[in-house]
Amino acid sequence: MKNIKGPAIFLAQFMGDKPPFNSIEAICKWAASLGYIGVQIPTIDPRCIDLKKVAESKTYADEYKGTIESCGVKITELSTHIQGQLVAVHESDNFIFDNFAPKKLRGNYKARTAWATDQVKLAAKASKNLGLKAHATFSGALLWKTVYPWPQRPLGLVDAGFKELAKRWIPILNAFDKAGVDLCYEIHPSEDLHDGVTFERFLKATGNHPSVKILYDPSHQVLQQLDYLQFLDFYHPYIKMFHVKDAEFNPSGKSGVYGGYQDWIDRPGRFRSPGDGQVDFKSIFSKLAQYDYLGWAVLEWECCIKHPEQGAREGAQFIKDHMIRITDKAFDDFASAGTDAKLNRKILGI
């Protein structure tokens, strides 16, 4: 068994217009002051990273890495959630997702897809230059609108959808394979990879590509009413990233999983700060330790009630309290009889 690394924090939800949240150095120092030792960096925000420069210059990447570490934290992984989303967008969603892309590309959906693909490929090179082993992204979605089978899905639609999704991602996956970096898809509603079955469909469609991995976030599984602990039993060989994010699901006679188009505060399924929801993190950390998870425990804060600064402050200690120091001996070693071949034969009656 291995010791999990952490605590770390995903910076995306904390970037803002005022200090210390408006520059990468300031926010890293802030994170370190709270007890975090790692930061996960969103590559869509130019205040956080010059992705192209880090990808194309090992010298600059070393300088950038040194700057982050001088603030008291390490880079855990990079993220291309926004860019990954744009790798696969259903045409009916083009308008609503256009704000994710640079202004010059809005309305030019073919160019937007090419830009997104290039961005994620750059992240592979940047991750390699920074010495990182895993990367976070979204799969995008072509089939999500058919997740509820009404009207009835035509035969072959799902296979065709995953075939096209794999076609778009395989060149990117090849770039990650070449870089020696795992590409971890966050299993997430609104993405075509939103549960274990859809992950398996995608993996098969890519020909079991070795770079296809999982970012595990139990909060999304609570909101789907999926068994998030058994998910670890099924998919632990693929889980290379972990978001510590809590959630609660309190259905009523009025609303359930779909949420009734309500705001987050009123939805039966809501994201919460760690410890305020229903996720059994003690069991999660135990299972991750049992399965030799080698990555980081990264706080992702998305709570509809608590202030983010309070969530960040409490989150560092929450992760520390759940991290397990792996034992180096069996609890009953004191009663060990040692190794005795003759005794073993006697016990076996042979």
Please place each PLM-identified region on the residue numbering.
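Active-site acidic/histidine proton-transfer and metal-coordination neighborhood
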Residues: 25, 29-30, 69-70, 85-213, ...
